[in-house]
């Protein structure tokens, strides 16, 4: 299987997001990379399901709370940005203050 660099990056992000989801399900608090991967992978999947940019921006802010992440992580993450593919092309999705 031959993947472009972008496809490899998306696959790695998906894998990291799945690992973060498993850790969250076990009750572990997520660290910085796990938090970014968790939110990003959920956004990419929601875009694939047909959600709009505006819907993704709102959805991304509902995925995690301060109780889901390690102390200080919420203050470290001001925005999460991800390029997602939509029927009309690739767009940048920005979620402001994703952990509330």
Curated annotation (Swiss-Prot):
One Pfam short name: Urease_gamma
Keyword line: Cytoplasm, Hydrolase
Name by which UniProt lists this protein: Urease subunit gamma
Localization of this protein: Cytoplasm
Gene3D superfamilies per record: Urease, gamma-like subunit
Species annotation: Flavobacterium johnsoniae (strain ATCC 17061 / DSM 2064 / JCM 8514 / BCRC 14874 / CCUG 350202 / NBRC 14942 / NCIMB 11054 / UW101) (Cytophaga johnsonae)
Record carries keyword Transferase: no
Enzyme Commission code(s) on record: 3.5.1.5
Family statement drawn from the similarity comment of this UniProt entry: Belongs to the urease gamma subunit family.
Binding partners and assembly: Heterotrimer of UreA (gamma), UreB (beta) and UreC (alpha) subunits. Three heterotrimers associate to form the active enzyme.
A biological-process GO annotation: urea catabolic process
HAMAP family: Urease_gamma
Catalytic reaction(s) noted: urea + 2 H2O + H(+) = hydrogencarbonate + 2 NH4(+)
Protein's pathway: Nitrogen metabolism; urea degradation; CO(2) and NH(3) from urea (urease route): step 1/1
Gene Ontology CC: cytoplasm
An example Gene Ontology molecular-function term: urease activity
């Amino acid at each position: 299987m031959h993947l472009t660099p972008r496809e490899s990056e998306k696959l790695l992000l998906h894998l990291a997001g799945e690992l973060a989801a498993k850790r969250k399900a076990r009750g572990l608090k997520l660290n910085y990379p796990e938090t970014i991967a968790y939110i990003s992978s959920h956004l990419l999947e929601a875009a694939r399901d047909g959600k709009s940019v505006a819907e993704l921006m709102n959805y991304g802010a509902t995925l995690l709370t301060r109780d889901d992440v390690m102390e200080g992580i919420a203050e470290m993450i001001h925005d999460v940005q991800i390029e997602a593919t939509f029927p009309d092309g690739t767009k940048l999705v920005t979620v402001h203050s994703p952990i509330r």
